Amino acid sequence: MTFKFRLLFLCFFAFGTSELFSQNISGKVTHEGSPAAGISVIVQPSGKGVTTDYEGKYSINLPIGKFKINFSGTGFKNVVETVVLVNGDEKTIDVDLKQSNLSMDEIVIVGSRSLPRSSANSPLPVDNIDSRTLKTTGQLSFDKALQYRVPSFNTVNTPVNDATTLLDPYEIRNLGPSRTLVLINGKRKNLSSLLYVQFSPGRGETGSDLSAIPTDAIKRIEILRDGASAQYGSDAIAGVMNVILKDKFEYSSLTLNSGVTSKGDGATYGLSYNSGANFAKRGFINYTADFSQQNNAVRSGLIDLTTEIATFGDPSQPVTSPTNKAIADYLAIYPDANNKNGTGEITAAKFSYNLGIPMGENGMFYSNAGFVSKKAISNANFRPSYWRSDAGLLHPAGTTYIGYGPTFEGDLTDYNGTIGFKNEINGWKSDVSLTIGGNSQLYAVNNTVNRTLGAASPTSFKPGGFSFTNIIGNYDVSKSVLENFSVGFGTEIRQETYSIIAGDTASYSGEGANSFPGIRKENATINSRYNIGAYLDASWDINKNFLLNGTIRQEKYSDFGNAFVWKVSSRYKIAGDKLVIRGSASTGFRAPTLHQIYTQSTQSSFVGGSIALSGLFNNRSKQAFALGIPLLKPERSNNYTVGLGFNPTSNLSFTLDYYSIIIKDRIVYSSSISSNDPSSTLGKILANAGVKTIQFFINGIETKTQGLDFVANYKNINIGKGKMSVNLAGNYTIANEIVGSPNDPVAIKDGGSTILNTQIKSLLTESRPKYKIVGGADYHIKQLSINLNGTLFGKTKFQDLDNGGSDMENIKQVFTPAVVTDLNIGYDITKKVNFSFTINNLFNVLPKWKLEAINANGQTVLNNSTAKNLLEGFLAFSGRYRILGYNGSQFSQLGTTFQASLNFRF
């Protein structure tokens, strides 16, 4: 090809391309005369699209041809305009959208297996939260955003992190992470491999890693606040969280964010990219990449000398005695004892995609997947020279030894993926899918020693880790058999595998690596199980106002057998849709997780000249058998909900729901069992089993949880030239209590011990807020948006015997109510660039606690100022955890944080 020919070809191509796309349509989209921003304008069949700017304007260049222009937005009825473009056309299409009584984002999938319904028409309480609402919180992760938007949802960082730095426990209605089922696009998400063992809410349980889901990948969240075991199987006693991923592509988005606390630490950095494409008539791909870094924020307190001497010195001697003077001299130089307690350092990379490929007129092949890689580093308590020696390994020879600070490092990977095919033939809708998922965690402990090994000890250890995987097959069918009657049925087959990975020998030999002992080789194991379940669901609109829904489900597990559950729900509308009365009754179950069945974490020590084991023993161990501890069986629940919804106008809504959840055979992680009397039956059993102390999982209690949820929204309020929406939602716990006495095995009961001491009972029943209320206002005017949100955290209580001793049998540590206020300001710099600034905890409110006596003995202690001060010191580990105490509170200890975000759309 000659140079001239190439030049001619390029000129022709440029001219032809210019002619091909020189046609244009533009216009303005309004609602009741006001500009409608963020409306999707999609061209079919090409799939090309834009969104309207803050003035409601749009513009698209198109080739010659005939097109359908679809205008759609949340809360509005779709409008479709047909346009024919010839060479050089420039056409204007203005559209005024009408408000829809039923927007697409009000359609909820969760809660029914036969027919999706609007949240207003559902017989069940469902929260429907869009991605924008999550982003205005300014929180870095999905789970923390929910904390400040959903009253019945709770999660918080624990001050003593270790493995929980990788993911924090969460729960709905104070029932722990293992009783909330997490779905992604309606498919079960894998559990984490981490079993929470610290004395914080969620102890002895595991849940999914919510922080693994990129916020920019989320279209909306559906939270069903009702038991749903009949629809979905195990783990849905408290409710179901369904994460709906973005699907139809609207625009690409690049978001840069950075933040810092008011103390100048805890810096955060993030980059998120979301994009995709539309193809064919219904095809789409939407994908997200998210990278973030969170630095350490230190909130250590000053050490109280009196408590420190009582812990590490000799309180019977004066401060001038050699032992006590060493402590006093050290704290004079290092008042915080060199501690770096606070949040850990976390680096994360997250990826997600959602794909749909049309197959024929009604078929759709779909696939979605997510992957996250996280690395976390947290600091253990610093070991001052008067607490621990380092055998000369952690400080240079000839220098003064001041102690050492162990660090914990964790590497986490979490993944999930689904492929499936949906189709409709003669009104029968079918969905067949395969889902895989997994979570693995490997740990390292550095800058510490194994004191048993002395000078031969390494200073870095690999303590092992955990892994969990599942493979799930689903087949679901539904049909509207009659105009007012629909059915759904299906099956699920699930296989789960849980692995415990041993650490290196030095990490567990003797007392193990100081601060985080490793997993012993004999405790490492790989175990699997499978289950198959089938359900039948029917929904009957008896008339236009009266709905009745019922579901039954049968499950079979390879390790414990069968489970049968059912659910009925109903809804009655009065005065059209203005007043809705709804209710449900159901039974549920939760299978013990493989973590609870097989986890064993023990350490050895010399007792009476022989080796004795202490720690967590699984229920299949000979030690548990000797104590008469039975194998775990499923929890059983009875759920009841009754509520009403009031919708006087399309802009005003109010719902109130009462719930009651009774859980029988609830699985708990026991107290530490020991015996001071070797001649007792308990003492003999422990001695014969070679056990010093033992803990285990057991179907130990029956619990009753009752409460109220309310939600109120008022939107589209005209204020000046802008519009405002206000919301108020709350959760109030009427009762969260243990019914009757714990199911103590005979040997333990006769030995004067119990599986649940006061501390564990307190943790289960009163360590989450008694109430939580979230209120806010959202105002938009032209390019400016302002969101003000306040969260009232109610009182929590805790009886910390581990740190406070026996005095805490008569005294409670009470965290007082507090309001945390968040402010988010957004501004559209241009049509495609938005700047957002968030101040979380605007007034720098910190958790505050005090001691309250529950009887005369407790009041006697509190009336003695010396005893009271000493007790307060013990609860905060001599002041190391001055803000939270050793075991956490209702909300973050970081105080005010600032977050800035810059978003580009293209």
PLM feature segments, named:
Residues 28-34, 38-44, 72-76, 86, ...:
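Short, acidic, small-residue-rich periplasmic hinge/interaction motif at the N-terminus
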Residues 47-57:
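Short, acidic Ser/Thr/Gly-rich low-complexity loop/linker segments typical of extracellular
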Residues 58-61, 187-225:
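Short acidic/polar hinge/loop motifs at secondary-structure boundaries
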Residues 545, 658-664, 668-801, 901, ...:
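Gram-negative outer-membrane beta-barrel transporters
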